[in-house]
Amino acid sequence: MVLRLSQLFLRTLREDPVDAEVDSHKLLVRAGYIRRAAPGIYTWLPLGLSVLRKVEDIIRQEMSAIGAQEVHFPALLPREPYEATNRWTEYGEGLFRLQDRKGADYLLAPTHEEMFTLLVKDLYSSYKDLPLSLYQIQNKYRDEARPRAGLLRGREFIMKDSYSFDIDDAGLDASYAAHRAAYLKIFERLGLEVIPVAATAGAMGGSKSEEFLFPTEIGEDTFVRSAGGYYANVEAVTTVVPDEIDFSNAPAAEVLDTPNTPTIDTLVDAANQLAPRSESDGGAWTAADTLKNVVLAVTLPTGERQIVVIGVPGDRGVDLKRVEANIGSHLPIAGEIGLEAANEEDLKKLPWLVKGYIGPGLSLDEPVLGLEGSSKVLFLVDPRVVSGTTWVTGANAEGKHVFGLVAGRDFVWDGVIESTEVRAGDPAPDGSGPLETARGIEMGHIFQLGRKYAEALDLKVLDQNGKQQVVTMGSYGVGVTRAVAALAEANNDDRGLVWPRSVAPADVHVVAVGRGDEIFEAAEKLSLELEAAGLDVIFDDRPKVSPGVKFGDAELVGVPTILAVGRGLVDGVVEIKDRRSGEAENISVDKAVDYVVNAVRTR
């Protein structure tokens, strides 16, 4: 195929779009691949659609290789299946909801678990029909509060989502492993570096979960890794729990006056003045000796606002993403929630809690925090708060703190939650060394859903003994539009895009540089010969465009090989340039086609 720029629907831009924040967004718009239709919504232009289709083709090939079959669901879905799994409510404000003229409720699909489950339920009824894997490549919709970064976080996007159906957990393990291997092949063929990391299931539910992250400083996800091979999304990192301590000989807790000490820093200063410690007793007080009780407000999908207090060592901050990922095991919810620091109105309703001096209570006989305490608020603690650890914390009175409060002796808690920030240097939970942190973009996510959706929608089959068994499921997603953006993010320079050959909109970009008919005819002839050799060609045949603009557009568009026909034609040579390395060679005209074909097939 030869795309003639004189006919191609394309306009390149010299300046970055004003709303663009990241390289991929800037360059995809400037090079004429996409155009913004509305915040978080983009139109795909011919060159962009070519790249998108090549990404989709690679995904289809690898899905087919593991036996997955393609289907296509509507994007507009009825409310009822999502009501059955509670996700109509649980998705909160992130779900696009609408009504038809008769008042019936519909949604624009964020994911299709329910529809896949119902389809299999409708058609299959025996263990002999399993295992089964189905997939689709389809538009998805999420009402992002702040769409950003072009295709990386939009309101409409394309995903490949697949689902496996098995009779037992062993089958699910096999399906999960097959999809995991397929994903690694997909990203390898795309030329995109990804790292599989342990993850939490979030709104999807289920047990085992992994994300495939593209490492980049602009990523919204933080992950950790160790030299020994531990990788995890920061939300999934578990704390190395200290041993419990015998507190039988620990001295009684004591309340001290600590005026004007509402912060950890002021408390530590006061502690070192009021109750200095010798080196044998632990040395100077530090923030790590204090128990900071953070009051959070959780807005449930129903709109109800629930207060939660989390006790953490004072030298640690609370990571709201980690709280959000792990709070579901302590509250009867799933799906999207709102999470923020409690405000003044929240605290007014809880007079037992004195801002800056909040503590769990002075003894087990008079608990303040916890569902059994006077405040009746859920009290969770960091895993480092184990029985026998001793703390300085608030006494629930203005200007007073309690020293020597012993966990398990003087206070208890409703549960333990992974909530604090993960730091570089923290030990890996598997003992593989200290952690280092990095940022990345989620390119794919795989889940062992188990029986959550099958139970909710009554998907059962007859087993070998003629008994009804609930099917176990896996869910596997790849962000297709996000993959295009990540490829653009990873493959560019100061002149424009530099596509990998596997997804480039063409194999070679032919530029006719000069005004003579001979130059144009030679460039056209080479373009047609390259097409006949099986290559996709962009031919810049624009008659009234300067050589500088043509070369600038060729580098901006980012096809891997640029073939320029110009003044060298009088000597029987053309220039062939590798877009990525910048290396250029003069090749004789009669060898140019073979040279380019060889470059395409060997690089």
Swiss-Prot record:
Alphabetic keyword roster: Aminoacyl-tRNA synthetase, ATP-binding, Cytoplasm, Ligase, Nucleotide-binding, Protein biosynthesis
EC number: 6.1.1.15
Keyword check for 4Fe-4S: no
Gene Ontology cellular component list: cytosol
Biological process annotations from GO: prolyl-tRNA aminoacylation
TM region positions: none
Cellular localization per UniProt: Cytoplasm
Catalytic reaction(s) noted: tRNA(Pro) + L-proline + ATP = L-prolyl-tRNA(Pro) + AMP + diphosphate
EC class name: ligase
rRNA processing in keyword set: no
GO MF annotation, one: proline-tRNA ligase activity
Family assignment from sequence similarity: Belongs to the class-II aminoacyl-tRNA synthetase family. ProS type 1 subfamily.
Reported function: Catalyzes the attachment of proline to tRNA(Pro) in a two-step reaction: proline is first activated by ATP to form Pro-AMP and then transferred to the acceptor end of tRNA(Pro). As ProRS can inadvertently accommodate and process non-cognate amino acids such as alanine and cysteine, to avoid such errors it has two additional distinct editing activities against alanine. One activity is designated as 'pretransfer' editing and involves the tRNA(Pro)-independent hydrolysis of activated Ala-AMP.
Subunit field text: Homodimer.
Free-text note regarding domains: Consists of three domains: the N-terminal catalytic domain, the editing domain and the C-terminal anticodon-binding domain.
Protein name in UniProt: Proline--tRNA ligase
Protein source organism: Paenarthrobacter aurescens (strain TC1)
Taxonomic classification: Bacteria, Bacillati, Actinomycetota, Actinomycetes, Micrococcales
Chain's gene name: proS
